[in-house]
């Protein structure tokens, strides 16, 4: 009783029935959401606890937030062997994000030179999950070296990234039906700003950059649709 009282005073709680945590229900929930016959394509079909957790999260979101969850398009298993795992005490003691004293400088403060909200979030995830695979580490280093050595490419990419709004946030608002006309215009402008990055990447001499460029979708139909529907000063 004391534990429950303490829990209720410090945290928000939301009751879920036991059937929400059954593997069969969770599996069906995920398959229906992603519109697939099985979860093999996501590499989680044998991860029982992961399936249950992901299914419960989707159910919780549908009950408490909204039914429009189509912007959640994938589920990925974090392979423990690929990353260095750190508990919250280690993260705190290393001062990765939060300083332990008033005048201290965190690692994030030192290395965060990102120029977009998406890049900032990605860097935080990379700090939280350091790579263990040497090839993957070297691949990142080679990309950094390419940006340093290729002034024209670096300048083009930097300039275009500065024209891009927080696309992840905008897409989430669109999916939930909460985006304003002005935000839709910002999304269009952001998609247009990606096109020069895609072109420069595909023409680069670095194979990894070329592959990244090929993965960028032009979204030309969407850009045209928004342009024909809304004025820029909407």
Residue spans for each PLM region:
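Conserved interaction-surface patches within small, structured recognition/assembly domains
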Residues: 148-154
